[in-house]
């Protein structure tokens, strides 16, 4: 059988000139700003124009573009290799970005040419949210219209290999930080407006469950740890505490910090600029230890492969 795996991710501008249209696509998503048109269209135009220069400055720090597509391609290559190890089926990975190329309508054409017997939808969002997972799946379904058996993986926040991969990386950096003093481990996730959480979005509760499983598996006596949220935009109330405020508190306590980006699985502007430049500057020199994202970690790729294999043999979850 031929099986297509669609890897969903956010996407990112591939040049400085792409920043404004990328931002427009982001804020025009009804799962991000829930307003009827023409108000959502006008607001997306306004926000993308207003934030363009600030966002461009961010991307200038990392070569004038987002590395997310390149990093996702590396994950796709590793996953395709893993899935095709036994040779029972032919798996082909397709990358589908939400707010910049390759868009769903472009990917659908490639999938049709492949002509799979089965399609597996795999968001690169470990924790489910209507703003990420659901938005990507809805957008795919709107564009795909394929008569093909389709399975959807909604989340994997508690997957054993996913947790173990985080434990291994966090433990490594904890040991490094321990040479200075007793570290505080901060698990940083992308924040969301509280209004979305109050409508029943499970994202925050799944973040908490992920972190508690990691902490339990770390098995470090009297571990000092906390959950914090980054990347807030706008004046409304978001999930707290903020990563910035927690880093400031750690600075006041004069302790080393191990920071793990718990909701991101690849490096992009929120990790390479926000965490590695802006937030790092808060902490005393030599006291900041940033755990890398899972990227192509062998256990993480195994996690994704097993999810695909399990869903191929089961009903849609």
From Swiss-Prot:
Fe cation binds at residues 190, 270. It is an enzyme of class 4 (lyase). InterPro entries: Ferrochelatase, Ferrochelatase_AS, Ferrochelatase_C, Ferrochelatase_N. It comes from the Bacteria. Keywords: Cytoplasm, Heme biosynthesis, Iron, Lyase, Metal-binding, Porphyrin biosynthesis. One of its GO terms (cellular component) is cytoplasm. Pathway: Porphyrin-containing compound metabolism; protoheme biosynthesis; protoheme from protoporphyrin-IX: step 1/1. It is found in: Cytoplasm. One of its GO terms (molecular function) is ferrochelatase activity. Pfam families: Ferrochelatase. Its EC number is 4.98.1.1. Belongs to the ferrochelatase family. Catalyzes the ferrous insertion into protoporphyrin IX. PANTHER family: FERROCHELATASE, FERROCHELATASE, MITOCHONDRIAL. This is Ferrochelatase. It comes from Wolbachia pipientis subsp. Culex pipiens (strain wPip). The lineage of its organism: Bacteria, Pseudomonadati, Pseudomonadota, Alphaproteobacteria, Rickettsiales. The gene is hemH.
């Amino acid at each position: 059988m031929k099986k297509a795996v669609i890897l969903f991710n956010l996407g990112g501008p591939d040049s400085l000139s792409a920043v404004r249209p990328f931002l427009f696509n982001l804020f025009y998503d009804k799962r991000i700003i829930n307003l009827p048109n023409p108000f959502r269209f006008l607001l997306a135009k306004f926000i993308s124009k207003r934030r363009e220069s600030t966002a461009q400055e961010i991307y200038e720090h990392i070569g004038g573009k987002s590395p997310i597509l390149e990093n996702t391609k590396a994950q796709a290559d590793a996953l395709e290799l893993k899935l095709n190890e036994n040779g029972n089926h032919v798996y082909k990975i397709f990358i589908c970005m939400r707010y910049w190329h390759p868009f769903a309508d472009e990917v659908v054409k490639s999938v049709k040419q492949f002509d799979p017997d089965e399609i597996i939808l795999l968001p690169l969002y470990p924790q489910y949210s209507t703003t990420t997972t659901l938005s990507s799946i809805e957008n795919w379904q709107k564009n795909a219209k394929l008569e093909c058996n389709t399975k959807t993986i909604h989340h994997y926040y508690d997957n054993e290999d996913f947790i173990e991969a985080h434990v291994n990386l966090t433990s490594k950096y904890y040991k490094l930080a321990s040479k200075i003093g007793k570290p505080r481990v901060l698990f940083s996730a992308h924040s969301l407006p509280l209004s979305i959480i109050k409508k029943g979005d499970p994202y925050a509760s799944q973040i908490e469950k992920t972190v508690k499983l990691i902490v339990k598996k770390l098995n470090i006596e009297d571990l000092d740890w906390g959950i914090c949220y980054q990347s807030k935009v706008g004046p409304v109330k978001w999930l707290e505490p903020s990563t910035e405020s927690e880093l400031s508190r750690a600075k006041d306590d004069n302790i080393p910090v191990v920071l793990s980006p718990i909701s991101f699985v690849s490096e992009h502007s929120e990790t390479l600029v926000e965490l590695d430049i802006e937030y790092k500057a808060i902490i005393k020199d030599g006291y900041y230890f940033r755990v890398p994202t899972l990227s192509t970690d062998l256990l993480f790729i195994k996690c994704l492969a097993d999810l695909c294999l399990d869903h191929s043999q089961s009903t849609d979850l």
